[in-house]
Amino acid sequence: MSSVDQLIARTLGIAEARVTDEVEYQSIKEWDSLGHVSLMVALEKAYGVPIDDELTLSLRTVSAIREFAAGTTPQQGPAAPDDRAAVHRGLEGVVFDRTGITHIDGVAGVLEYRGYSIHDLAAHASFEEVAHLMIDGELPDAASLERFSKELHAARALPGPVLDLARSLAHAHPVEALRTCVSALAAFGQRRVDGSDETYEQARETGITLLGQIPMIVAAHHAFRNGREPLMPAEDTSYAEAVLTALLGESPTPAAVQFINRGLIVHADHSSNASAFVARVATGCRAGMTASLTAAVAAFGGSVHGGAAERVMTLLDQVGSPERAEAYVAELQGRGEPVMGFGHRVYRTEDPRVRHLRATVVALSEECGDTSGLETLDAVAAAMSPYSRHGVAANVDLYAGLAYRLLGLPDDLAVPLFVIGRTAGWVAQVLEQQSNNVLIRPLLSYTGPHARPFTKGNR
């Protein structure tokens, strides 16, 4: 076996016999996005040649990597056999519809909500303004903002059976409790409409109600598991202050409210992410707003989607100190395991949301007089720098969990807090999907046997 084949096998953690021309990116579980970046870094080290984005896209098959190692220019991926359609595993690079909500330029690191830069919104807007922008299409004037805020305030109260359900789930993980209670709202809400009959106006009303109720579910469950009754925030509190008041059971500091407001804004939407896609698929089935958001919450709790935010805190505790960061990263890479808080399917540079969350962590760390967590995460980011050139840069999950911990909130609330902000985007995407709806039904390429004879002996 050639040295490049050995490099591929060693980097991906597979037997050398599995390194064949038929193997390509995403065709085996070991050659996922992280495995591909690890391969590019290993090839750079072995051959002393920098691998740019264009070459990274070309080196997606064993045959192309063999050509590269032999000093020839690899072709742009294999052509699909005539009798088989091209397969896009993970739907990577597939554009399935159009949107007017969120624009992402992954190369330049740009994120815009309906044309407004995330940097301007995070610095100057309230979450209510951004939610209005998402759902109703424009930033509100004073009168529109007042009406919208009143809608959110009126939606906070939870039905008694849903509160009872949250109490009975005090032992459960907050994401599991949230998913279950959101689903229950469809049965106990004020308006019960079958999804196939739900009008745009009814869907919007339900969406606003969910935007008001979801943080109260998270807060009620947190209160019950801590042996206290839920606290209903005063009507005149902002959305961010209401969220934090309900969670803490007391009035928060202005600095804490400012962070929550900023965190909700940067989490509000991210185009066709996995959970938003799930919500659109459910909407395409005419499942209704509540069912679509229940599906989104379920997807969001997955460990490689929203669930990564909580796992970053496990990483922080395992690393322990800045001095151990480099060795920790090397250990994970050696085992072919991802480093939580790094890498994104879209961005080829740093996630534009990161700077806002890190700035908050800096401020909170200084306020608390404890910068150890920040220094450790920064050291991990430095250790990951060889991978950042290949798209595995810091993402939105890296600093969010530490900020919540500095506010005195447990690590397992990182995902529910992310969900609270993302609800605005889910509602907007469900409404956009509903306005020009279509059943989303892609195909699978069958690879099994054909024309197998059946006899009773097969049973």
Q: For the regions a protein language model found, what residue spans apply to each?
A:
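Phosphopantetheine-dependent thiolation modules in NRPS/PKS and related acyl-activating systems
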Residues: 1-80
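Hydrophobic alpha-helical bundle cores within soluble ligand-binding/oligomerization subdomains
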Residues: 78-459
